[in-house]
Amino acid sequence: MSKTYNFYCDESTHIENDGQPFMILSYISTPYHLLKMHNQNIREMKIKHFYRGEMKWSSISKSQYPFYNEMIDYFFNSDLNFRAIVIDKSQLDHKLHNQSHNDFYDKMYYQLLNKKINPEFNYNIYIDIKDTHSYLKARNLKTYLERDYNNIRNLQVIRSYESELMQLTDVLMGAINYKLRGLNKVTAKNNIIEKIERHCGKPLTQKTDKAENKFNLFFIDLKNGN
């Protein structure tokens, strides 16, 4: 029987003209048979720290720091993996490539997932719903992936409150975006970023090795096609 993985995908500042310099797509993956354990462990941590509601990068504060600090350690000490791709939006030139921003978005999501799909395994892919267009984007992505793979068991949109791992994806991705934008006003967020960087052994402004599985960070250079 083939091993199955769940991917929990999210995006940050992905709208073309939102005034933000970077577009980030990311996911956390887990072996399916360990999903229940991770959900239970995270919920127990929330209870321990009297944390209510969703984990979000925007929610990190001095009072919530102990919970998020433990959550980062949990991620790096577990079998969970994270991958993100970063696009510098100043390099976007959709007219040159005869595409819309939605077309580009679909292509980037494919690039996010394509490099880590193993034909020997099966996959359930979940995408955080953002708006009414999310369903169409998910359908397009499913079409792209099924063109090259026959092991995508399920691809659907869900709301972040339905998934602890989707929420954790938001936290890790938020740390990357915060660091790249040079923001540093919230001490608790700075400390979380420093903790992630200690685990990774490098700053969040640098790409990781392509073969890195635990925390894979890739900066796409649209000008040079890589």
Question: What do these predicted ranges mean?
Answer:
Residues M1-N226:
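Phosphate-ester processing/binding pockets and catalytic centers
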